[in-house]
Amino acid sequence: MNGVMEAAADIRPKSGDGSSYLDAAFGIGARLLRSAVWHGNICNWFGPVFEEHAGSHQLACGTLGPGLYDGTAGIALFLGYLGRELADPAFKRVAHAAIGHALARAKDIPEGIKYGFYTGEVGIGYAAIEVGRCLEDPTLVTRGFELVRTAAEADLDGNAVIDVMSGSAGVIPVLLRLFADSGEGWLMDAARRRGDILLARASRDERGLSWDVLGELAGTMDLSRLSERLADIKAGDRSRPNLIGFSHGAGGIAWALLELGAASSEARMQDAARDAFAYEDSWFDAANDRWPDLRLHDAGNDVTSPGPIAWCHGAVGIGLARMRAWRITADERYRGDAVAALRMTARSLLNGSPASANYSLCHGLAGDAELFLTWAELTGDAEARALVDTVAARGIQDVVREHRPWPSGIDGAPESPGLMLGLAGTGYFYLRAARPVRIPSVLLVGPESKPRPAGTAYG
């Protein structure tokens, strides 16, 4: 790893320029303010959306939904933090209007993903709580907690999605974070119920513990809405192995179970987390130094696709989960996995084409940089922080100074307003790069952790 870092010396800024990062966040925030569409005291944005046409989902332009991932709740979260950090009433006003839209339209979310974090009501409620705190608006905080409680205590019956993106695995750590803040017992009770759902839906084989996330999702929604290459997956289809990775795979679910086990002292949750991490470990390709993309894998065939580097699928999300696992357990195996993820991601960053890469949190440079920012917070590692500054400086040089649109995480859409795929997420990255202690990660939302002693190196 050190050799890779030395090769980056010629493109690495000498130090993080916090003022320019705030300027970049301000510029993105100002663009969102100018493009907001108002209706009374709430607002929305036009952006890329997928609409059904002739039996398939095609990219179109339309108003955004209410969710955290790609809707008004996510934009509100960014603008709320930005308004607080800059003490700017204009950003605060639009943050309030955006979260007002999200709260009003939460009822429109499809049933299959309604109770999740990134796509559902728990995420909207969480954003309302955070925006309310930024704006010192106790009414918003109360409304946020009420929505989280409604979603957390809903009767999921047979419609429980299980992954981090839309299901119980994403909700559990958020409930635990809110429990740590408030001490409200219903939050822990709801987290335990969600944990029981995860254990009940798990599959065990010689590799470890895993979940048929795509099959579960196919039973609740048309997967072509996520990707055309997933359109042929049906509920109960066992022709593909269960996924690894963070947003839809075993690693993200393992992280949720580990957080629950640590908070509740339930050994069965901790044991299940260990077995789920073991499943993910079993797929690691040591010869090629990668985790494969099992979305592209059919049973009986070799995995030949390059290993992905992203939060949603790949080394970034896997690394974030292992960093947190190391923090909770002090197990050096998890540290080793985190180092592997750092190595792969650094290699991708330094060998890639930053001018054409997108700056999304989900599967872009902003998300890649979060892996190094989290590691720097955890260990005090200066090299990791330097890579964050490299990514940030590239964006300022290639996009801001060249007056280009920020590349989004949606193919065919040069710019998008949302949090995980677009402008709000890019702005969030710059705000967090400038104020990492004050701005929490939105890619690993769970109970707070304390940094390890400064100077802990990797590689």
Predicted regions span which residues?
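Glycan-recognition and catalytic cores of secretory/periplasmic carbohydrate-active enzymes
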Residues: 1-459
